[in-house]
Design a protein with these regions (language model features):
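A substrate-engagement module of RecA-like helicase motors
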Residues: 78-81, 137-139, 143-259
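Walker A/P-loop
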Residues: 107-128
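Signature of the SF2 helicase/ATPase Hel1-core->accessory helical subdomain module
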Residues: 235, 241-261, 266-369, 431-443
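Walker A/P-loop NTP-binding motif
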Residues: 104, 123-136, 155-159
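A contiguous, basic/glycine-rich beta-loop/short-helix subdomain that forms a polymer-engagement track
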Residues: 236-257, 275-276, 364-477
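Acidic, Mg2+-coordinating catalytic module of metal-dependent nucleases/exonucleases
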Residues: 1-38
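Interdomain "pre-motor" coupling segment immediately N-terminal to P-loop NTPase/helicase cores
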Residues: 29-75
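Conserved pre-motif I regulatory segment
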Residues: 67-113
Length: 478
């Protein structure tokens, strides 16, 4: 087995472009024992030319996989069972019933909220009927988490792309993508940590394979997150960038405009709709697991800053002595304001603040320039959207961490961004939250058409009640 693994490794290295192997050699001293010799052997006899599937920028030596070109889309059948069969799947009665409900709702101009039980294959249930309609141009699908987003791209999207040539794109925030400029700068140095240098080698190989630049494709990166924080994208692209034409975040933005189906997550959907009110204009928007969008709206209306980490960071900057006199004074003012807030919180834990009460802190933040890490932590507080501030402290065995938290006066009005969409379909495992409240109310939506599909009662569920405990309604506060 070890010998087979070695042969596989040798074949893999030999299949890489020569330019990539040469860059691997610059870091090969960080490998264990004599593994470097395998790389040196692989470069012998390597062709100097570069295959058409790759592209390289001579100044950096980094080799990338050339962006894919998409084939003409195949037309889907109007019959759900036929499309399912073409995917080599079997149609399920409840899945088909759900798909038929989706088709019926397309003629309704109101927002449609469809309640359907879990486990019936809802993703194909809404994708197939929507993609089969000639008047449905583009579709945006929002799911609760990046994990589910990746799952759809690896399963349903991959199958639909293979059979029908449907152009899917997974859209995430810029921090999910590698920034090639930042990565290139790390290649110009040999880190003292061998693990970091091995990650550089891994990324050089990965860049010859990835079509997205999505760092979620890298496994076990949590082992050294500090390095990945250094090379993740910040959403900015310098005019003189060596990689302007191949920047993954810019490519992702462009692909999102061209794709037939864009898959994103609830949190990033809210971010994009707030930044770009036309993001869903003329498109069919499907919010999957709509009941969880309520939590995303609540999280989106808040922001927090770790004041303990902030103070540590300010202290390190001041100790370095590299700042100008003005910057030093501003940092000292910021340090004083933050320390004062923490001390005040220890005396009055329930105290809340408005923007006027934090005016000096916010003013110092606005004047502070050149400290990008600090600004990244603090800049969201400058927006007038946040009106209420308070502090919270988490206690651990040997230390405590204090956070400055900010919230908006009201939750984001989701309905303000939806009228531009061609059609909005919210799929939810439940519509009713209580006797007088439902998911639509919590999302702040009016003119919602609610459709509840029959749901099977699951016989394997049980609720256990401890009868020795007092009833909540009659128990005293003591």
């Amino acid at each position: 087995a070890t010998g087979q693994l070695l042969f596989h490794l040798m074949d893999k290295i030999a299949s890489l472009p020569r330019q990539t192997i040469e860059m691997l050699l610059t870091f090969s001293d960080n490998l264990l024992f004599e593994t470097e010799l395998v790389i040196r052997d692989a470069i012998r006899g390597q062709n100097l030319g570069l295959s058409k599937e790759y592209v390289t920028l001579e100044e950096s030596g980094i080799v990338l996989r050339r962006p894919l070109t998409y084939k003409a889309e195949r037309k889907l059948s109007q019959d759900f069972d036929t499309n399912i069969a073409l995917l080599d799947l079997e149609s399920r009665p409840k899945q088909k019933e759900f798909a038929e409900a989706v088709i019926r709702e397309l003629d309704n101009t109101d927002i449609s909220m469809i309640q359907a039980q879990t486990g019936i294959g809802k993703t194909y249930g809404y994708l197939l009927p929507l993609l089969a309609q000639s008047d449905v141009d583009k579709v945006v699908v929002a799911v609760p988490t990046k994990l589910l987003q990746n799952q759809i791209m690896n399963q349903e999207a991959k199958a639909l792309s293979a059979v029908f040539n449907i152009n899917f794109h997974s859209l995430k925030g810029p921090q999910n993508y590698i920034k090639l400029d930042a990565f290139y700068q790390t290649l110009l140095r040999q880190d003292s940590n061998r693990l970091v240098n091995r990650y550089k080698m891994q990324l050089l190989v990965w860049l010859t394979e990835t079509e997205t630049g999505d760092l979620d494709e890298i496994r076990q990166k949590q082992r050294y997150m500090a390095y990945f924080d250094e090379i993740k994208h910040d959403g900015k692209l310098e005019a003189d960038s060596l990689f302007a034409e191949y920047d993954f975040w810019q490519q992702s933005y462009q692909k999102a405009q061209e794709a037939r189906v864009v898959v994103t997550n609830h949190a990033y959907l809210l971010t994009r709709m707030e930044d770009d009110h036309d993001f869903v204009r003329g498109k069919t928007l499907v919010i999957d697991e709509g009941q969880k969008m309520v939590l995303a709206l609540e999280q989106f209306s808040r922001h927090q800053v770790n004041l303990t980490v902030l103070l540590q960071h300010i202290h390190r900057i001041l100790d370095s002595g590299s700042q100008s006199l003005l910057q030093q004074r501003l940092l000292e003012n910021l340090q004083f304001e933050v320390s004062h807030l923490i001390q005040e919180h220890q005396q009055f834990p329930q105290k809340q603040y408005n923007r006027q009460q934090l005016d000096r802190l916010l003013q110092t933040i606005s004047e502070l320039e050149g400290e990008s890490d600090l600004m990244e932590m603090l800049s969201p507080l400058k927006t007038p959207l946040y009106s209420h501030f308070w502090l919270e402290t988490d206690y651990y065995q040997e230390h405590r961490v204090t956070y400055l938290k900010a919230s908006r006066q009201e939750l984001l009005e989701l309905s303000a961004y939806l009228p531009s969409a061609q059609k909005v379909i919210i799929v939810s495992a439940t519509i009713d939250v209580g006797p007088d409240v439902d998911v639509a109310d919590l999302l702040g939506l009016d003119q919602v058409r609610k459709v509840s599909l029959p749901m099977d009662t699951l016989p394997n569920q049980a609720i256990w009640i401890d009868q020795s405990m007092p009833m909540i309604g009659i128990a005293s506060e003591e």
